[in-house]
């Protein structure tokens, strides 16, 4: 048993919970293949999106947790369903008219609309691999097309023929009457057109390894099920793959949950053992709709990394995988600041179980870097950017250096990156939407009180003392709810309904600069 076992289990961190499930499923035995196989899947009909990254990031968290608890070797494969027939043309690709002429063709048989690779499927696979490589994932890439054509699934495909009636008994009750009449687990690849055919199978022969169907002209066509001449419908394909590859762990989105029983049962029918499974909730866009590769209605990995470090994206993936979460640009600043908080807590924590419970342990697979931001958050930088409208990060560093003389781009490279990210985020998402509140007579009294307070303190006054003074002014102003007081101040001074702790902000921005800001709002008609 691993030396860290007790603390890992005590932490109740979900990657360790999943890792223990895998160990329990092995009953203390090393698999015949001598390693534990983790599998992620990718449907390359559209460009890879952040959900694709998320599945792989989460999978690696479980894989690394398993390696902490056991000395059994592991392997991660990323499986691309690139032999699927094209059912719909994505809205976010070039040359859609050209692609539309290849409906029902395997994705690896469609010309690349981007003009870069040998096929549409190859282009999408390359995109997936490039960003998995970029983030250091260690995986083996499996192409459905290659697996079928190379004969990797041949033994299982013959077994599907042998178990044909049993599989049909399992599948048919899940369909409507009209689909029952035409369904078969096999989809022949038409020898003439190359299309993936969804046609009734008239005859199947396990000994010969063939199926027979009628083509469009009404002629009988007999094809082998092996060697890439047929592929399985996606539900039987899922279970067959588990059995063929001996997958030990798989995670999938909630859209697969209703069919998970079928995948597992088909795997058993074919003589395999279903893997331990985790069903994660899907990401939603800002309208509460499921994000989609073909719609392109999500944040891409590149989008996120334009405005924030990769660790913040990994944190978003780690948090509550079984709970649906909205994924849009507003979540980025929150995740950056939560990452900073978790990082600081991790390095202050001496209890190992609590360290294991900290998301950053799993984000960095136990090798957590120590970052220094001198108490400056991403949200604070966004608000600083909002008032000084800098052309580049050197302007922000002018304020940061006065706030904390020890802070420089060299002593805090993380903070330096955040300054750059904050300017980009402000310019793209905040600047155009600022809406200032014109101060009422009541507000002007408050602003004058703030001015008087600021003129009575020095640059050495602590942020907490400034915060308390601001708070006291709000209490004196007679607000029933001080949230309304701060909201009014944010709208008057920053043009937004939410903002930072004003004591910290004023300390960072500077007393004199804040007085000028307040005077501008107080005396401008």
From Swiss-Prot:
GO biological process, one term: lysyl-tRNA aminoacylation
Catalytic activity from the UniProt record: tRNA(Lys) + L-lysine + ATP = L-lysyl-tRNA(Lys) + AMP + diphosphate
Binding site for ATP: 293
Pfam families per record: tRNA-synt_1f
Motif range ('KMSKS' region): 290-294
Source species, domain of life: Bacteria
GO molecular function, one term: lysine-tRNA ligase activity
Subcellular location field: Cytoplasm
Keyword Protein transport tagged: no
PROSITE patterns, A to Z: AA_TRNA_LIGASE_I
EC id: 6.1.1.6
The UniProt record lists the keyword Protein biosynthesis: yes
Family statement: Belongs to the class-I aminoacyl-tRNA synthetase family.
HAMAP family tied to this protein: Lys_tRNA_synth_class1 (MF_00177)
Protein name per UniProt: Lysine--tRNA ligase
Organism expressing this protein natively: Rickettsia felis (strain ATCC VR-1525 / URRWXCal2)
Lineage of source species: Bacteria, Pseudomonadati, Pseudomonadota, Alphaproteobacteria, Rickettsiales
């Amino acid at each position: 048993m691993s030396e860290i076992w007790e603390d890992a289990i005590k932490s109740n961190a979900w990657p360790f919970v999943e890792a223990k499930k895998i160990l329990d499923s092995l009953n203390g035995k090393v698999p015949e293949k001598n390693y534990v196989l983790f599998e992620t899947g990718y449907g390359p009909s559209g460009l890879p999106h952040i959900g694709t990254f998320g599945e792989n990031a989460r999978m690696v968290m479980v894989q690394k947790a398993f390696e902490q608890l056991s000395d059994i070797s592991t392997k991660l494969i990323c499986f691309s369903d690139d032999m699927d027939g094209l059912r719909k043309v994505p809205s976010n690709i070039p040359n859609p008219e050209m692609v539309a002429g290849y409906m029902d063709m395997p994705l690896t048989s469609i010309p690349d609309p981007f003009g870069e690779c040998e096929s549409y499927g190859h282009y999408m696979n390359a995109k997936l691999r490039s960003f998995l490589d970029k983030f250091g994932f260690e995986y083996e890439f499996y192409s459905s097309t290659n697996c079928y054509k190379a004969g990797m699934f041949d033994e299982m495909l013959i077994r599907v023929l042998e178990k044909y009636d049993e599989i049909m008994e399992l599948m048919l009750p899940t369909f409507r009457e009209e689909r029952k009449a035409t369904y078969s687990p096999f989809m022949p690849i038409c020898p003439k057109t190359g299309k993936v055919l969804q046609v009734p199978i008239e005859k199947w022969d396990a000994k010969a390894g063939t199926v027979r169907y009628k083509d469009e002209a009404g002629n009988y066509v007999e094809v082998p099920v092996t060697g890439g001449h047929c592929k399985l419908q996606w539900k039987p394909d899922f279970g067959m793959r588990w059995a063929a590859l001996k997958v030990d762990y798989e995670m999938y989105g909630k859209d697969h949950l209703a069919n998970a029983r079928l995948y597992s049962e088909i795997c058993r029918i074919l003589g395999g053992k279903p893997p331990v499974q985790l069903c994660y909730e899907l990401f939603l866009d800002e309208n509460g709709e499921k994000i989609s590769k073909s719609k392109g209605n999500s944040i891409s990995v590149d989008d996120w990394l334009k405005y924030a470090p990769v660790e913040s994206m990994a944190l978003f993936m780690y948090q509550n995988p079984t709970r649906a979460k909205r994924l849009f640009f507003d979540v980025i600043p929150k995740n950056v600041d939560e990452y900073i908080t978790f990082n600081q807590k991790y390095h202050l924590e001496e209890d190992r179980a609590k360290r294991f419970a900290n998301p950053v342990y799993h984000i960095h697979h136990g090798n957590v870097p120590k970052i220094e931001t001198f108490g400056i958050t991403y949200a604070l930088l966004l608000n600083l950017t909002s008032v000084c409208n800098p052309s580049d990060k050197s302007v922000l560093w002018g304020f940061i250096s006065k706030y904390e003389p020890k802070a420089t781009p060299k002593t805090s490279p993380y903070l330096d990156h955040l300054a750059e990210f904050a300017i980009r985020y402000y310019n793209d998402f905040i600047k155009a939407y600022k809406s200032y509140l014109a101060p009422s007579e009541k507000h002007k009294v408050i602003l004058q009180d703030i001015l008087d307070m600021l003129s009575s303190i020095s640059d050495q006054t602590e942020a907490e003392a400034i915060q308390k003074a601001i708070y006291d002014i709000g209490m004196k102003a007679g607000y029933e709810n001080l949230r309304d007081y701060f909201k009014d101040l944010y709208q008057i001074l920053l043009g937004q309904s939410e903002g930072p702790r004003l004591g910290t902000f004023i300390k960072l921005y500077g007393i004199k600069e804040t007085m000028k800001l307040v005077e501008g709002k107080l005396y401008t008609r």
